[in-house]
Regions:
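Internal catalytic or translocation cores that form aromatic/hydrophobic pockets or channels
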Residues: 51, 72-73
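A short coil-to-beta-strand element that immediately follows conserved catalytic motifs
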Residues: 61-69
Length: 149
C-alpha cells in the first residue's frame, strides 16, 4: 500500500516506565515495543482516536490527554514498507488500578491477543529494548534535535 497513514499514539507513564505492547518482525527477527493507539479515521480527531483504540483493544478508558508532538515514521515491517504521520499524546488511565498490573491483555481488531506491559525508559535508552516509532524516545525525554538559529 503506497499511502501515508495518519495514526495517533498515547504514552501512559508510570514512574520511569511507559505502557507499550510487544511486537515481533518475522523478517528482521526483531522484538520491539510500541505505544498504544492506531489509525485516525476520517472526521475523527487524533485524541479521540486514542480513546477509541484503547477502548477497542484493551477495554480501558483514557482520561486526560496532552499533545506531545508529531513524528514521521517510514519503516518496514515483515518485509512491507509503511509511511506514517504519528501524532503523539501523553495520557492518563481512568482506572488507577491498571498502573499496578504487570500486563493488560486485550484483543486487536483482527482477533489477535494484544499484551500491554510497563517497560522502563532506561531499557530503551540503554539499547536493551527497541521502541518504535523512531524518535519517540527522544520526544519523551526531551532530546529532540533543535536547530541552531
Amino acid at each position: 500500500m503506497n499511502q501515508i497513514r495518519p495514526i495517533a499514539l498515547c504514552v501512559f507513564r508510570n514512574k520511569d516506565r511507559i505502557l507499550v505492547f510487544e511486537g515481533y518482525d518475522t523478517v528482521k527477527g526483531e522484538t520491539f515495543y510500541r505505544s498504544l493507539g492506531g489509525g485516525i479515521e476520517f472526521g475523527e480527531k487524533a485524541e479521540d482516536t486514542v480513546r477509541r483504540e484503547l477502548m477497542e483493544e484493551l477495554n480501558v478508558e483514557v482520561g486526560e490527554v496532552r499533545y506531545l508532538g508529531t513524528l514521521e515514521n517510514i519503516f518496514t515491517f515483515n518485509g512491507n514498507s509503511y509511511h506514517e504521520i504519528v501524532m503523539v499524546y501523553d495520557g492518563a488511565l481512568v482506572d488507577s488500578g491498571l498502573y499496578e498490573q504487570a500486563v493488560i491483555v486485550g484483543k486487536e481488531a483482527n482477533g489477535d491477543d494484544i499484551r500491554a506491559t510497563w517497560k522502563s525508559l532506561d531499557e530503551f535508552g540503554e539499547g536493551k529494548s527497541i521502541l518504535y516509532p523512531t524518535g519517540l524516545l527522544e520526544l519523551l525525554v526531551g532530546k529532540q534535535e533543535k536547530l541552531d538559529l
